[in-house]
Structures are given as C-alpha cells and as structure tokens.
C-alpha cells in the first residue's frame, strides 16, 4: 500500500509499504525514486520483510518544494517517515545519494529506531574531491553537469545512466531507468547535485554505532570503490562486500546476490 506522509508544512512524501515483518527502509539515489528497487520490492516481502520505499522530496510521487534538498532536511524527512509509521528495529538501506542521507540520519538523529544500516554503492563519505580526500569527481565536474541539466536534461540524464551499469543490460531497461530519472523535478535534481558536490560526512562516520553492511561494485564509475574503503575504515561495526564485476548499478546487476545478502544481514 502507499502512504502520503507530511514531513513539514506543504511537503508530503510518498512511501510504498509492502509486506509484513521486520521493516527495511530504502532510500533511492540521485535522481531516481523508490521504483529503482523493483527487484528488491519483488523479493524481500517473500522472505518475511516489510519493504518501505521512500520517494525523497522532489522525486517520484512526492511533493516538489523549491528548497530542502540538503542532507539535513532529507534526514529530517526520513525521521518523519519513521515516526509516522511507528517503525522500530528497522534496517535503513541507502543507495548512492540515499546512502549519504542514511549516514546523515544516523548521525543527526542518533540512529533513532534503526538497528542496522546498509550502504549500497553509497555516494559517501564525500562525492567530490577535497583536501585529504582525492576520490570522486571534481566540484567543477558537478557544476558542468548542472549547466548541462539546464540546457538538455533528458540527454544529460541519458548519458549519466550509461555510466550506471558495467554489465550489458537491455535497451528497454536503460529506457525504464531514464524514465525514472525524468520523473524527478528539474530544480530538485539540480539542488541535490549541489548537496552532493558540497556535503562531507567523514566526521560523522564515527557516530554510526550499529552493524553496517557496505555493498559496492569494484567497477563503479560514479561512486568509486575507494568510497567503500573509506566507509569501512570509518564505521567500526562494518563489513564490506565487494562485487568484482559490477558498477554503480549492482542493485540490478547482482540482484540475486544482493537480495540474499540483505536478507541474511537483516536476519542476523
């Protein structure tokens, strides 16, 4: 079933809620929505889990305010979802930008009602290069991408989508993926890009006190595998599982293995 959850005045998020059992909250990446987790949504309820897919503000079926795309506000939105649905002992799973927002939630809200964390191809601890952190894109690369969004968003997103998958996927799946990205608000996409460019979570990793599973493709061209190694180094109770032949789209390329790992970790 679907919920519309008010997180602040004039902002309501859409949340897909399927199945019964221990809740796993999925936070999507940039600029996607909860439907990207279709292959987890189809499987995890059969294994006794409650799938909760959040459309972050500006994405999917959620409201599209002009502002509030910083990680603090996004994390507060997640807190409102957890509170409204009265979730306890939840597993929080974030993909790419969603992984970064999950980390901010754990630090900002002290991991309230979350017992375990899953970081899937996370765009964290920082998405762009900075002193002491030579990984990821340059900030100028994000600025250039934003200008391309303003000029021709569909083509720019299509080009971005080509970098997601390391293995060959069908043209139809690529088109489906592009359609998900085009559902996002244009200004929300840009504002989230600014957050990805500027946010730095390195000092917040020590605040994560729960068991954490890090799943990351070694051939990720969007969130390099070095990100995963930095997360492993900074989060005490963490386990890193690399996917040797997958890119950023490991959630699809390795869906059977990832679903099994999520279920095993969530049941442990």
From Swiss-Prot:
GO terms for molecular function: hydrolase activity. One of its GO terms (cellular component) is membrane. It holds the Pfam family Abhydrolase_1. Its EC number is 3.-.-.-. Keywords: Hydrolase. Residues 23-254 form the AB hydrolase-1 domain. Gene3D superfamilies: alpha/beta hydrolase. The active site is at residues 96, 220, 248. InterPro entries: AB_hydrolase_1 (IPR000073), AB_hydrolase_fold (IPR029058), AB_hydrolase_sf (IPR050266), Epox_hydrolase-like (IPR000639). The keyword Cell inner membrane does not apply. Belongs to the AB hydrolase superfamily. This is AB hydrolase superfamily protein YisY. It comes from Bacillus subtilis (strain 168). The gene is yisY.
